[in-house]
């Protein structure tokens, strides 16, 4: 499995500076909407609820401007991901206290715990690379950001 198998370009968004994403809740709502893009059931409201419940346990802001909101749903047919890039930054209660610029959300069926952990590890490895994060932040739109992820996963320089 590669990330672009569960992350379509329609689920990637680059938010304009000063756009509607100015808080953690705004970011979670935007991610839920992206995750719900094309979904019938479960939908956006379920996705938002799961992300908020997970954030209530502990922030998924892992530092270096990155957050990986995630969770599991009983009736989800397969893994789904969304990417939200906020060049202006979002306060997110990250572990390092800094704002978050890159939010990569993943939802998984409850029965797929192993798959979920592998996906989170894959995202973490990808976003550990400072130069890759800078390229994502410089992406003009979601399609370009999606292409950068695809290239990185194919082992080509992004």
Question: What is each PLM-predicted segment?
Answer:
Residues 1-158:
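Cytosolic covalent-transfer regions centered on His/Cys nucleophiles
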